Amino acid sequence: MDDKLFVYNALDGACTFEIRDAIWNDIKADGYGWTYGATIRLFEPLIFMMTRGIKINHEALAETKQDIQAASAAAQAELNKLAGRELNAQSPKQVQTYFYVEKGIDPYRGKEGQITADDKALARIARGTARRPGMREARLIQDIRGYEKLLGSYMEIAFDPDDRLRAAINPRGTKFGRFSTGKTVFGTGCNLQAMPQEFKKFLVPDDGYFFMEKDKRQAEWVVVAYISGDARMLHVIENGLDPHVYTGAMMLREQLPPDLQRQVTDKDLEDIVRLDSKVIGMLTDADEILQRRMADKTLRNVYQFLPRTMSIRQCGKKANHGLNYDEQYRMFALMNEIQESEAMKIIKLYHRIYSGIQHNFHAWVKQQLSKSGRTLTNCFGRRIRFLDEWGPDLYKSAYSALPQSTVVDGLNIGFCDIYEDDYITRTMNLDILAQTHDSLLFQVPITVLTSGKLYDVSRSIDKYLSPTMEYGGRKFTIATDTKVGWNWSGMHKDRNPLGLQELPECRSKLEFNQLVHHTLGIRQGSGVAAARNMASGSTRSTPAGAR
């Protein structure tokens, strides 16, 4: 290699330090010293992750590529049958002609007024309106495009010569502290942060290891609760309730006649939400949902107060995930494929239940922006300045800033603490392989489990990942869920039986060890040899869809 490149690289590094020294006083004076220090601390563990990479199961990758191609072909065949001819889902012209000319639908337009049949337009066409039923063809086109994107973006990724997936990680890739990831300098790898579940199934632990994922539970929702001080949100967290069930139950309560509201308890309503979730599951067809509810002697009495196209628990989940940052009804309807009138109703109910979000949290953020020169500072010391034009878009960005940055900063502090703990990463030989905003992926030697040491290691990791935070005089931590499995995707009994499975709360070391052995399919006392073949078991499945 040319010596000029080495000299250039050395000068580049030296100049960076000279620049740092020149502006260091300004960095500290402006309050960005914490952010600088936290970023520098991340470099060594990030370099480890980028160097280590994750093993690929190529056989399973090839099998699922075939399955996705078959699913795409089946969707195309159904689309052609409905259209009465071959319809190219990838052709904007053909798709626009089909819906806007042949079917007579009023054209949807993009931001600059141009006619479009992009994903948002297709979602609206598939959803339908009060005057027009939804169209199956639009959903099929979305699915076909999704399958093709999955094939092109993830099934054709260039891997490194050692059959591992690596990514370049930028610790300052986003405004609020989240990492951004992409291809390496060698042109291999991909964006790990946006990786679909279908692909994660082919990322597997090295021989003699299993995967353990630590995931912060309802993390941003918890932060919003403590910033806002909303009594109902705090009640959910501090009593260990299911927030999606509770939100659904309170939405149901708000719609009941006053005399009936006085007769039922919160537990009664939560039981109805759980029953509805069991009966409806993930169905979205309004007619089938109504039929199932009318067949149940309990649900038929309250069906008129339940959402038409999903279970009430699913409604609570979508509201919890989407409405803390002032999402408006049109976007909520589009993202969740429901009618705008339903979206308006859900949003009104949500903010009636959790009034502290708008009255306390949003009002406080606006006040802080005005008082502190458009700047917010999270509980760890990260300062975020907003330079956009005053208005709804700036406020929405600011509402999300503190919860997002608080979660990722708390996680990254724990990430560094774990990496620097010699017992965990060197004596026990755990590898940290990935960070995805609110979770960490580890590969753990099977010997750590079979020797009975996993419980203590897991608890140490949980402690590192649970720093005490404070907003408005309210101190709190965010609970951590533990998942174990033989690949990085979520467990499904049919589609991915070897995937990550969440462990319930355990009362003792013995119970924890028994549960992990059972979840991984390792017979206690069988040793490492009996477990080594688990990760290479069949992962063949029919994909649920690219969307």
Model-flagged regions — what are they?
Residues E44-T51, D162-A167, P171-T174, Q255-P257, ...:
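Conserved catalytic core of nucleic-acid polymerases
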Residues S460-G472:
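A common structural junction motif
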Residues T447-R459:
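Short, conserved charged micro-motifs
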Residues E102-G104, V185-G189, I227-A231, T450, ...:
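Short secondary-structure boundary/capping segments
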Residues M1-E198, V204, G208-F210, R217-E220, ...:
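Conserved "right-hand" nucleotidyltransferase catalytic core of DNA-directed polymerases
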